């Protein structure tokens, strides 16, 4: 179907939803690299005007990647919640935006329709929204998940403690874990990106995390962010696996470039569930995503990178995850050039993920060769905290010495907690109080005398 829009003496034509969505996207380097971005600001506005008039039902009839060639498209269509969609089925994309911003779109009503919203609908409406719109609507979305604690409750923000080390040195990792715990981080998980893919090393790191969590009785979960096939093998060997991790993307071809498909993810989830390691819930999948991953694998099918990203959330949604996060600026300036593009993408990702019913966090980050700095990350972190982000990263000094990129620190998390009054997962907050690390108001006690005790228990 061809979509047309007249502006002045010019008629703009867009050949199908795929092109319409791409041309309506706010500027970013990845879409320019792919050759699918709008040629001018006027063409972008024309695309948005045409997109606003598209009925939501059209997204169920016109796939941006064909049903026959892509299992993610099949997942989206086959799992669509028609009863949930009924409440918004009469709306256009523009009307959907108006409804989302209205008082009628409450946390309860958004939860009822979330499974009826396809990723392309979410991506489409986001392209009509200013940053403040993305923040306001995401704030209304209530999404919780649970394993050893409860994540995503109103007025709370969690932190993944990220103690990476360039040589997977257990002492260095343990020191970073101690640093994070004393600063109140780690309720989302303690998650290590390993430098090695050797199963023996991964197993050692899993046992390290399990020992620390067990000895200190921390109500949290450990994760080593290795490939899902490695995790499956280690589960078979009896390793103490809490969360099953995998990077995912929004097309079948992109996921195959990662070495995964939906069947493998189902197998991994079932294996994780068989261990029964959760205490307050059984959400155990952890997914990471990021705009540009499909394009980097030449697996984007000329779909814009933000719509591809939203489609990755359909994959995540199928597996009831504990955690999902966009690593928003990690892929580099070829896909998100500067601070402005990273900030916009982070807000889009959080909005789309929450709208689709996911416990979405964001790694507020950039690479050292991007036109961005820590002030840009302060801005994005503050906006996401205002939007109710589920979790962020806690990296010592915000500088990941293994992955060589800049993220957010334990102190950055304390900043937004103070600014917005955000608490941690309730079970984790209670543990901090019992351990003497926080006072009765859940503020860190700053008791330096506890350092030797905790250090000795960590390395026991």
Where are these regions (language model features)?
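Anaerobic metallocofactor- and corrinoid-dependent redox/one-carbon enzyme cores
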Residues: 1-176, 182, 187-460
């Amino acid at each position: 179907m061809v979509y047309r829009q007249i502006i002045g003496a010019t008629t703009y034509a867009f050949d199908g939803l795929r092109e319409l969505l791409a041309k309506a996207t706010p500027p970013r380097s990845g879409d320019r690299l792919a050759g699918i971005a709008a040629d001018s600001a006027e063409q972008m506005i024309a695309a948005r005007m045409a997109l606003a008039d598209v009925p939501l039902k059209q997204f169920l009839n016109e796939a941006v990647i064909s049903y026959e060639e892509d299992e993610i498209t099949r997942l989206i269509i086959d799992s669509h919640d028609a009863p949930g969609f009924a409440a918004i089925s009469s709306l256009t994309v523009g009307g959907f935006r108006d409804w989302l911003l209205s008082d009628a779109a409450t946390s309860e009503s958004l939860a009822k329709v979330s499974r009826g919203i396809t990723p392309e609908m979410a991506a489409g409406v986001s392209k009509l929204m200013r940053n403040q719109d993305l923040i306001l609507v995401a704030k209304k979305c209530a999404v919780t998940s649970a394993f050893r604690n409860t994540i995503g409750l109103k007025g709370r923000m969690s932190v993944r403690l990220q103690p990476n080390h360039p040589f997977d040195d257990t002492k260095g990792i343990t020191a970073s874990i101690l640093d994070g715990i004393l600063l109140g981080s780690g309720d989302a998980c303690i998650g290590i990106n390993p430098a090695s893919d050797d199963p023996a090393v991964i197993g050692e790191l899993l046992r390290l995390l399990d020992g620390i969590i067990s000895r200190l009785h921390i109500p949290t979960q450990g994760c080593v962010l290795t490939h899902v096939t490695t995790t499956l093998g280690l589960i078979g060997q009896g390793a103490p696996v809490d969360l099953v991790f995998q990077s995912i993307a929004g097309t079948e071809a992109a996921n195959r470039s990662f070495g995964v498909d939906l069947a493998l993810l189902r197998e991994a989830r079932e294996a994780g569930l068989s261990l029964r390691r959760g205490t307050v819930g059984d959400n155990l999948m952890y997914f990471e995503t990021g705009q540009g991953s499909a394009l980097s694998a030449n697996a984007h099918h000329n779909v814009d990178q933000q719509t591809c990203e939203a489609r990755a959330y359909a994959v995540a949604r199928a597996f009831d995850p504990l955690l999902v996060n966009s690593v928003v600026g990690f892929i580099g300036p070829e896909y998100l050039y500067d601070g402005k593009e990273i900030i916009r993408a982070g807000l889009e990702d959080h909005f789309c993920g929450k709208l689709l019913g996911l416990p979405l966090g964001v790694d507020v980050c950039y690479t050292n060769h991007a036109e961005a700095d820590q002030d840009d990350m302060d801005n994005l972190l503050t906006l996401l905290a205002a939007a109710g982000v589920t979790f962020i990263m806690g990296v010592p000094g915000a500088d990941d010495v293994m992955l060589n990129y800049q993220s957010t620190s334990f102190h950055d998390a304390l900043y937004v907690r103070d600014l917005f009054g955000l608490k941690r997962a309730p079970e984790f907050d209670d543990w901090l109080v019992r351990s003497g690390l926080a006072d009765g108001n859940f503020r860190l006690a700053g008791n330096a005398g506890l350092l030797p005790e905790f250090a000795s228990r960590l390395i026991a």
